[in-house]
Design a protein with these regions (language model features):
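Nucleotide-activated donor-binding/catalytic signature segment of Leloir-type glycosyltransferases, i.e.
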Residues: 239-266
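Short acidic/histidine- and often glycine-rich active-site loop of Leloir-type glycosyltransferases
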Residues: 293, 312-326
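Conserved acidic donor-binding segment of nucleotide-sugar-dependent glycosyltransferases
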Residues: 321, 325-332, 341-346
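A short, well-ordered alpha-helix in the C-terminal region of glycosyltransferases
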Residues: 341, 348-362
Length: 758
C-alpha cells in the first residue's frame, strides 16, 4: 500500500485534545509505516487566530463557515493524489447545528472517507440523530474509541455493525528508572503526588478534587494535588482566567495552599509523561456524563497510575477495583475515601499500577497504528498485507538483563529479576546474538564485552567431564534443578553457540575463538551419545558451524552419526500424513529439519536433505496461514490427530518465531528458493503485530520483547529468552534485507532506524 491520506482535524499548534490526539496518531503511523503512507493534514483553524502551521499540514479550513467547507470538498476532489480522507469529529469543531457544515463537505466528496466520532450522544434530539446518521451512512467506515459508543451507533443511530470499528485511544508506554529523582526535578521530593491534566474548564470538575484534598491533607500532610495544564484558550478568550481564579480562592478558603499546586503551562508530551510517571494517584473529575473518551485518562493508566474517576463512558469500561475506583459526579467524599485508602497502602497502589499498565498495553500507539492500517486496507480492498517497518536492532534490554556474571533469566515487566538466577540456555542464545551482531555491524567494545560475559558463563557451566550444567542461582551456585532435569537440550544449545562463535572467526578476536574451540573440542567425548531429538539437532548445528572454521573428518563423522540417529527417529514416527519426528509438535520444532539440512550440507547425503524438506514443508503447513504464522501453543501441544492446522490461541512464545526463521534462512542458503525469504518476512511480522491479537510483541520503548501471547493479552514481562530470540530474529532480517534487496552499506554499530518489510 502506497497511498495518500488526508486528515481533517484540529492540529498543533492549536491547543485542544483532538489536536494532540491527531498528532500522536499521525506520528505513530509515520513511525510504523514510513514510506508506505503519505499523510497530509487539513487543519481546522480558529477564526481570528492565525497559526503558523508546518508540514504535514497542507491545507487549512475554517470549519465554522459553510462556504469554506464546500470549497474544501472541491479542493480535495481536484487532487488526484488523495486516496482516502479521515475526519476527526467532535461537536463544536464544525459549524452549524451539531456540525451540519461538515455534512455539506462530506456530501460533495468523491473520495472514500472515514469519520471518527469522539463523542456519541446516547439520547440525541431528532436533528442530531439525523445529522450523525447521515454522516455515518456516507462514510466508508466509522471509528469510535469505546464499545459503548459503538453500541449506541448501532442501536440509536441505526448504523450497520460491519461499518463500525472500535479502535481504542492510543497510549504511550513511558518508563522512568528513578521515580524519586524525577520528583526531585519537579521540586516534589518526599511528596505523595495526586494529579490531573487537561485544558482547564468548568466541566473538568476540579472543585471536587480540591475539596477532597482537605481530608486527604489532614491524614497525609505531604500529599500534593497537581493541576496540570493551561486554561482552555476558548475559555480565556471569553472570560479570561475567572475559572482559575475561583479555584485559587477555593484553595485558600480550605487552607490548601501547600497541598494544591497549579502547573499553568501547555506541557510538552515528555513533560506530561514524566508528571504522570511520578503520580501516585490520578484524579479524573469531569462532570460531563456524555464524555466518551479522555486521552489523559488512558495516558495516566498507561503510565501505571491508579485512577479515581467519575463515571464517564470510558472509565466505566476500563476501571474496576483492580486498577482504580469509580465515584459519583461531584462527590468529594467518595474521592477522599478512596484517596486515603490508596495513599495508606503501598502494596495496593503497586498492584493497581501493574494492572493499569496491563489493561492499556493493547492500546499503545504502535498497536493503534496497526489497527488503522488494517482499516485503511479494508477500504482499499488490498489483499497484500502491509508490514510495519523494521525496528532498530538495539541491545539496550539485553544489556539491562546482563550483570557482570551473565544474563539473568527473568524480568518483572522490564526490570531484571536477580532472584531468577541464570541459565546456560539463555547465555548460549545471547552469545549467538552478539556474534550475529558483529557479523551484521562493525564489532565494538560494547558488544564484545557482552559476548565475553556470555562465553565465560558457558565455560563456568562446563564440568570436569566436559558436560554442562544449566541452572545457576543469584549467588552463582549451581542449583538442585540440575539434578532433576534432563540437561541434554541445554548441552546441545551450548554446542550450537560455541560452534556459531567459531564460524564468525573473521569478525571476532582470536582469543575468543580459541576459547570457544577448547570448550567445544572437550565436548567431543560425549556429543555422539546424545539421544534427545532436539539435543541432537542443536549439536548438529554447532558442528556444522565448526566446519565453517576448519575442515575435520572427525567432525563430519560426528555429524553423520547424529544425523543418522535423527533419521531413524523420523523413520519410526512419520507416515503418509504425518511427516514428523514425533507424534506431536512441541517446542523448538524447526530446529529438527534445519539440522537435517545442515547434515546434508556437511555430508552430501541426499536422504538427509529429503527428510529435511519433507518435514519442514509439513511443519510450515501447520504453522503458516494466509500471511501470518501461528505458533504452536506451549499450553497444549499439537498432536497427530488434531486437524489440518493448530488452532489453540495463547501460549505463543517468541522463541518459536526465531527458530523458524533460522531454519528458513538455512533452507534459503541451501536451495536459493525465494519462498523461504517470503516466509521469513511473514514470520518476523509476528513480533510487530501480525498475530491473532494484532498487537506488537516487540517493545519499542525498552527494545526488549514481551514473553508471549496469551489468549486475549500479551504477557508484559520481558525475560531473557524472549528478548534474545527477538534480537536473533531481528538480526536475521538484516540478512533477509541484503538478500531481498541491494546489500546495505551501513557500517555503524546501530542499523538504519527503518528498513522496509515490503
Amino acid at each position: 500500500m502506497n497511498k495518500t491520506l488526508l486528515f481533517i482535524t484540529s492540529f498543533p499548534p492549536r491547543q485542544c485534545g483532538i489536536a494532540t490526539f491527531a498528532q500522536d496518531l499521525v506520528n505513530a503511523l509515520h513511525k510504523t509505516f514510513a514510506g508506505k503512507l503519505n499523510i497530509e493534514i487539513c487543519a481546522l483553524t480558529e477564526p481570528g487566530k492565525p497559526a503558523a502551521y508546518e508540514a504535514p499540514v497542507q491545507y487549512t479550513l475554517n470549519a465554522l463557515d459553510a462556504e469554506s467547507c464546500i470549497a474544501m470538498a472541491h479542493t480535495i476532489n481536484a487532487n488526484a493524489e488523495i486516496d482516502l480522507v479521515c475526519i476527526e469529529h467532535e461537536f463544536g469543531l464544525y459549524g452549524g447545528d451539531y456540525g451540519h457544515h461538515l455534512l455539506g463537505l462530506l456530501s460533495l466528496l468523491d473520495k472514500p472517507f472515514i469519520v471518527r466520532f469522539h463523542t456519541v450522544l446516547p439520547n440525541p434530539d431528532q436533528k442530531c440523530l439525523k445529522i450523525v446518521s447521515l454522516i455515518g451512512a456516507l462514510a466508508a467506515k466509522v471509528t469510535v474509541m469505546t464499545q459503548t459508543s459503538a453500541d449506541i451507533l448501532q442501536t440509536t443511530y441505526q448504523l450497520a455493525p460491519e461499518k463500525i470499528i472500535h479502535i481504542p485511544h492510543g497510549t504511550h508506554a513511558h518508563i522512568i528508572s528513578d521515580k524519586e529523582e524525577v520528583k526531585k526535578r519537579f521540586g516534589l521530593q518526599g511528596k505523595m503526588v495526586l494529579s490531573t491534566f487537561g485544558l482547564l474548564s468548568e466541566n473538568k470538575g476540579l472543585e471536587t478534587g480540591i475539596r477532597a484534598m482537605k481530608r486527604v491533607a489532614t491524614q497525609f500532610p505531604n500529599a500534593v494535588y497537581l493541576i496540570l495544564g493551561r486554561t482552555h484558550p476558548t475559555i480565556v478568550a471569553r472570560e479570561g482566567e475567572r475559572y482559575r481564579d475561583r479555584l485559587v480562592q477555593l484553595i485558600k478558603d480550605n487552607g490548601l495552599e501547600k497541598n494544591v499546586q497549579f502547573v499553568n503551562s501547555y506541557l510538552s508530551l515528555d513533560n506530561l509523561l514524566d508528571y504522570l510517571a511520578i503520580t501516585d494517584i490520578y484524579l479524573f473529575t469531569s462532570i460531563d456524563p456524555h464524555q466518551a473518551v479522555s486521552g489523559t485518562f488512558v495516558y495516566a493508566m498507561s503510565a501505571g497510575c491508579p485512577v479515581i474517576a467519575t463515571s464517564f463512558v470510558q472509565a466505566k469500561e476500563m476501571l474496576d477495583e483492580s486498577c482504580g475506583y469509580l465515584i459519583d459526579f461531584n462527590n468529594d467524599e467518595q474521592l477522599a475515601d478512596h484517596a486515603i485508602t490508596l495513599l495508606g497502602n503501598d502494596a495496593l497502589r503497586a498492584s493497581m499500577s501493574k494492572r493499569a499498565i496491563e489493561k492499556t498495553r493493547n492500546s499503545i500507539w504502535e498497536n493503534v497504528a496497526l489497527a488503522h492500517m488494517a482499516m485503511f486496507q479494508s477500504i482499499e480492498s488490498e489483499d497484500q498485507l502491509v508490514m510495519p517497518n523494521l525496528p532498530p536492532a538495539y541491545l539496550d534490554h539485553a544489556d539491562r538483563l546482563t550483570d557482570e556474571f551473565g544474563m539473568m533469566q527473568f524480568a518483572k515487566f522490564d526490570v531484571p529479576d536477580p532472584a531468577s538466577g541464570y541459565t546456560l540456555d539463555d547465555n548460549a542464545r545471547a552469545l549467538i546474538a552478539m556474534c550475529m551482531y558483529t557479523k551484521d555491524f562493525e564489532p565494538n567494545r560494547y558488544v564484545l564485552d557482552l559476548a565475553h560475559k556470555y562465553l565465560d558463563f558457558i565455560g563456568f557451566c562446563q564440568q570436569k567431564d566436559a558436560r554442562f550444567l544449566n541452572y545457576v542461582d543469584v549467588n552463582h551456585q549451581f542449583t538442585d534443578d540440575n539434578n532433576g532435569c534432563n540437561l541434554e537440550d541445554s548441552n546441545g544449545r551450548a554446542i550450537w553457540a560455541l560452534g556459531y562463535l567459531m564460524s564468525q572467526y573473521q569478525h571476532l578476536p582470536t582469543s575468543m575463538v580459541k576459547q570457544a574451540y577448547l570448550y567445544l573440542r572437550d565436548s567431543f567425548t560425549w556429543i555422539e551419545n546424545l539421544t534427545s531429538p532436539r539435543a541432537i539437532a542443536f549439536a548438529i548445528k554447532g558442528l556444522y558451524y565448526y566446519l565453517q572454521y576448519e575442515t575435520s573428518r572427525t567432525v563430519v563423522n560426528l555429524v553423520n552419526k547424529l544425523a543418522n540417529r535423527l533419521q531413524k527417529i523420523y523413520m519410526v514416527a512419520h507416515d503418509e500424513t504425518w511427516k514428523w519426528y514425533e507424534p506431536c509438535l512441541t517446542y523448538a520444532n524447526a530446529v529438527l529439519p534445519e539440522a537435517m539440512m545442515m547434515a546434508w550440507m556437511a555430508t552430501g547425503k541426499a536422504a538427509y536433505k529429503h527428510i529435511a524438506e519433507q518435514s519442514f514443508e509439513f511443519l510450515c503447513s501447520k504453522t503458516f496461514r494466509n500471511q501470518y504464522m501461528k505458533v504452536i501453543s506451549n499450553r497444549n501441544w499439537y498432536h497427530k490427530n488434531d486437524g489440518e492446522q493448530c488452532n489453540d490461541e495463547g501460549g505463543e512464545q517468541p522463541i518459536e518465531i526465531a527458530y523458524t526463521m533460522f531454519t528458513l534462512q538455512t533452507f534459503y542458503d541451501a536451495t536459493g528458493h525465494s519462498a523461504y525469504l517470503e516466509k521469513m518476512r511473514v514470520a518476523f511480522s509476528w513480533y510487530l503485530g501480525n498475530n491473532h491479537l494484532k498487537q506488537v510483541v516487540y517493545n519499542p520503548l525498552t527494545y526488549g520483547c514481551y514473553d508471549g501471547l496469551e489468549t486475549s493479552s500479551v504477557n508484559q514481562n520481558q525475560g531473557a529468552e524472549s528478548t534474545v530470540c527477538y534480537l536473533m530474529a531481528r538480526l536475521l532480517m538484516e540478512q533477509w534485507n541484503k538478500q531481498k534487496y541491494v546489500a546495505s552499506q551501513n557500517t555503524n554499530a546501530r542499523p538504519p532506524l527503518y528498513l522496509s518489510l515490503n
